[in-house]
Amino acid sequence: MNNGTKLYMLVEEKPIGIVSVTKGLIEDLYILPDMQNMGHGTKLLLYAVGQCTDTPTLWILENNINAERLYRRIGFKETGRKNAITNKLDEIEFALT
């Protein structure tokens, strides 16, 4: 996985989700809106974690409460690192420790 991998989730042969994994960095986790709140995001995230070769980390926008809830439920914790996206919005790093 040194160059990164995109993982797709299919339901009845239709793509409903995607996530990218590069070493330990998990990015772009997305589940179609009409397929959310059914456990698909959790399953895809857990699979992505299993593909990581380094400590699983990810970044979320500070106002993305739903994503934060999912990541915390799996065991991710804030690392204390932040990136300013705009002067009013930060991106926060989480890691699975």
What are these regions (language model features)?
Residues 1-8, 25:
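A short helix-loop-beta-strand connector motif used in the catalytic cores of GNAT acetyltransferases and
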Residues 5-17:
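Conserved beta-hairpin
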Residues 16-19, 24, 29, 92:
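Conserved GNAT-family N-acetyltransferase fold
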Residues 26-36, 60-61:
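A short, internal acetyl-CoA/4′-phosphopantetheine-binding micro-motif in the GNAT/acyltransferase core
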Residues 34-35, 39-47:
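Conserved acetyl-CoA pyrophosphate-binding loop and the N-cap/start of the following alpha-helix
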Residues 42-43, 63-80, 84-92:
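Conserved active-site alpha-helix within GNAT-family acetyltransferase domains
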Residues 51-63:
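Conserved GNAT acetyl-CoA-binding A-motif
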